[in-house]
Swiss-Prot record:
This is Thioredoxin-like protein Clot. Disulfide bonds join C48-C51. Residues 1-134 form the Thioredoxin domain. GO terms for molecular function: protein-disulfide reductase [NAD(P)H] activity. Probable thiol-disulfide oxidoreductase that may participate in various redox reactions. GO terms for cellular component: cytosol; plastid. PANTHER family: 42-9-9 PROTEIN-RELATED (PTHR12452), THIOREDOXIN DOMAIN-CONTAINING PROTEIN 17 (PTHR12452:SF0). The active site is at C48, C51. InterPro entries: Thioredoxin-like_sf, TXNDC17-like, TXNDC17_dom. Signal peptide: none annotated. Keywords: Disulfide bond, Electron transport, Redox-active center, Transport. It comes from the Eukaryota. Belongs to the thioredoxin family.
Length: 134
């Protein structure tokens, strides 16, 4: 049906999450956060090969879902920024990221499902995240 994408970074993710929480229409939608590596300015592609592989699969799977899906694309930064052990999303108890891409189903204020970097490119694993949450 419809995939609505919103971009965020470490300094804007909280405001994007607050918008989701306060938006009455978003509460009834399926919401995801896709944590990604930034694009390399010299190539125009992500510096992360797993992100390059997973992004089109994730977008296609979510776009084909019959209900509206909202996706926050959360860009973690360039390679040195992401590799920092103190990266905000590595130490945030809600996310505890260890790799990118990471796809999470976000309901309310918490993660209701996730696919790590080695799983995020597999449609048969993405589809269960679209199931109604309980």
């Amino acid at each position: 049906m419809t995939l609505k994408k919103v971009d965020a970074n470490p300094s804007t993710l909280e405001s994007s999450l607050q918008e989701l929480k306060s938006d009455e229409t978003s509460r009834s939608k399926i919401n995801f956060i896709l944590f990604l590596a930034d694009n390399d300015p010299t190539t125009g592609q992500s510096w992360c090969p797993d992100c390059v592989r997973a992004e089109p699969v994730i977008y296609k799977t979510l776009e084909e879902f019959p209900e509206e899906v909202k996706l926050i694309r959360a860009y973690a930064g360039d390679r040195p920024t992401w590799r920092t052990p103190a990266h905000p999303w590595r130490v945030d108890s809600r996310f505890k990221l260890t790799g990118v891409p990471t796809l999470v189903r976000w309901d309310g204020d918490s993660v209701k499902g996730r696919l790590e970097d080695h799983q995020a490119h597999l449609p048969h694993l993405i589809l269960p995240l679209l199931a109604p949450s309980t």
